[in-house]
């Protein structure tokens, strides 16, 4: 199987968590695109979706799936999203697609976070994938200096602006042994909107696509 086929297998497995009448939280990225396409086949059974990005919202709407405002709902049973890396404690690096802030908001609201990815994303220690940090534009230089101070090598994502009108710097060279502590530390830097560590709110269920099939792992 190709990597894309593995992504699709994980995404289709997540449809088992979608119940009749449910509002579904939808993430962003290539794996989630497969989930959205699968969701289209059962769109008559759901009440709609909450999207973590404009790109996912457009894909949902193209399939005729209603996209709802998060502020207009009181309960979000499930959120389905991918990860750039996920460790054994279900802490993740996310934000390769630049939607980390909205992803983190929707994940915080959801009762259950289903992470869908292929086996290459499972790691022993986070940090090989550069950590995205969303920053207010006027704070870019200051935030970059602070990131260097803690041992990172920040690189501006050239030509990219988030759905919120901000910049992304990707931080290389971090071996993240304490993801919860680092998530908090980075978010305390003035000018940082949020960072791509999903540790304080990690995944509840991991659907990990391997050549032998999709493994279902549940957080302790």
Swiss-Prot record:
Active site: 103 (proton acceptor)
Keyword Signal on entry: no
EC numbers for this chain: 5.3.1.6
Any one of the GO BP annotations: D-ribose metabolic process
Pathways per UniProt: Carbohydrate degradation; pentose phosphate pathway; D-ribose 5-phosphate from D-ribulose 5-phosphate (non-oxidative stage): step 1/1
Disulfide bonds: none
Domain of life: Bacteria
Residues at which substrate binds: 28-31, 81-84, 94-97, 121
UniProt xrefs under InterPro entries: NagB/RpiA_transferase-like, Ribose5P_isomerase_typA_subgr, Ribose5P_isomerase_type_A
KW Ubl conjugation (keyword) present: no
Alphabetical list of PANTHER family matching this protein: RIBOSE-5-PHOSPHATE ISOMERASE
HAMAP family assigned: Rib_5P_isom_A
Xref: NCBIfam families: PRK00702.1 (NF001924), rpiA (TIGR00021)
Name of the protein this chain belongs to: Ribose-5-phosphate isomerase A
Species: Aromatoleum aromaticum (strain DSM 19018 / LMG 30748 / EbN1) (Azoarcus sp. (strain EbN1))
């Amino acid at each position: 199987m190709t990597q894309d086929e593995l992504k699709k297998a994980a995404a289709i497995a997540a449809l088992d968590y979608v119940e009749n009448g449910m509002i579904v939280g939808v993430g962003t990225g290539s794996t989630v695109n497969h989930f959205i396409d699968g969701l289209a086949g059962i769109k008559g059974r759901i009440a709609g979706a909450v999207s973590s990005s404009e790109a996912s919202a457009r894909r949902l709407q193209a399939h005729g799936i209603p996209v709802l405002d998060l502020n207009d709902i009181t309960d979000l049973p499930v959120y389905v999203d991918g990860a750039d890396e996920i460790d054994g404690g279900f802490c993740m690096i996310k934000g390769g697609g630049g939607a980390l802030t909205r992803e983190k908001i929707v994940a915080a609201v959801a009762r259950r976070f289903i992470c869908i990815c292929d086996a290459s994303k499972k790691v022993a220690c986070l940090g090989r994938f550069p950590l995205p940090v969303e920053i207010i534009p006027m704070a870019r230089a200051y935030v970059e200096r602070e990131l260097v101070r803690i041992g990172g090598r920040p690189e501006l994502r050239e030509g990219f602006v988030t759905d919120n009108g901000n910049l992304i710097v990707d931080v290389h060279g971090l071996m993240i042994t304490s993801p919860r502590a680092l998530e908090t530390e980075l978010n305390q830097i003035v000018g940082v909107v949020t960072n791509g560590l999903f540790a304080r709110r990690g995944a509840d269920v991991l659907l990990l696509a391997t050549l032998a099939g999709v493994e279902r792992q549940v957080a302790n």
